[in-house]
Amino acid sequence: MPLTSRQQLAVALIFITPAFWGVNYLVARSAPGVIEPHLLALLRWLMAGLLFAVPSWRELVQHRKHITTDWARYLLLGALGMWICGAWVYIGGRTTAAINIALIYALSPVLIAVVSALWLKERFDRLQALGVALALAGVVHVILKGQWTSLAGVNLVAGDAWILGATVSWTLYSVLLRRWSSPLSPMARLAAISAAGVLVLLPFTVWEVASATQPVLSLQGFTLALLAAVLPGFAAYLAYSVMQRELGAARVGVVIYLGPLYAAGLAWLLLNEPLYRFHAMGMALVLAGIYLVNRRSH
């Protein structure tokens, strides 16, 4: 069965969206000592929420009864997608190494595929399972720089617990986004979820600001929040929502695997970090995995 035009767009977004998320690696690297994690997450989703709401405000007003009726669902999605997957990553990044973050987050597509197959009854055959395994192998190959024996030397620290929590949270967010149908368009739905996320983040941010011993917001900190709002916030989440709707949670989950590869590309472009053969090998495995997961049965 050929892909529809919407599904073709969703497949194209699989290769575009990780570039937006890759920006978050740069933001997370620059944030410590500049802006507090909850404040960064709150400003990110406050600004991204406005970007979602402005073009969809008529729809939000039209469906206000639905939003108020399902407020608990939106609050949970906001907590999972904006608080835990936002602030917790920035907190964990203070004490854990980048290799640990990437390795733990690489579990997310596997968890999404398993939960989607068991709970949502999404069709997921053996070749698609092989695709997930290939993509996982590709990203681990890049993270370990082709030296698989170094996997035994990875040390776990307290920050890993924050990243593991964010990984599980992203799995639940992805599956629930697919599970809970909504009359709202992706844009309007994300506006409502962002508003809920800001509400969840607010008390933690107030506590963070009240206990701060240095200025809480500078021009550099605001710039980081704005950057996080526009690309890994507005653009990435909107694209992910569209992909979820058209392709399903399990098939879209492998997009996470492109993140470290795109981050390596951004580091090469912006930070002059070199690219090696293990990057090419990892990319080949990831692309093969994505093809198997998203192929169409005839």
Q: Across the structure, where does each feature detected by a protein language model lie?
A:
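Membrane-interface helix-cap regions at the ends of transmembrane helices
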Residues: 27-30, 34, 48-68, 137-153, ...
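Helix-helix packing/entry segments at the starts of transmembrane helices
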Residues: 18, 41-43, 86, 101-107, ...
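Specific alpha-helical transmembrane segments that line the substrate/conduction pathway
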Residues: 39-50, 89-123, 128-129, 139, ...
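Transmembrane alpha-helices of multi-pass small-molecule transport proteins
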Residues: 33-84, 111, 169-176, 190-209, ...
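Specific transmembrane alpha-helical segments of multi-pass solute transporters/efflux pumps
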Residues: 20, 24-25, 53-105, 141, ...
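Juxtamembrane helix-loop boundary signature in multi-pass membrane transporters
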Residues: 1-16, 107-168, 278, 284-298
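Transmembrane alpha-helical segments that form core, pore/gating elements
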Residues: 26, 52, 112-114, 118, ...
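Glycine-/small-residue-enriched transmembrane alpha-helix faces in small-molecule transporters
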Residues: 1-42, 91, 152-179, 200
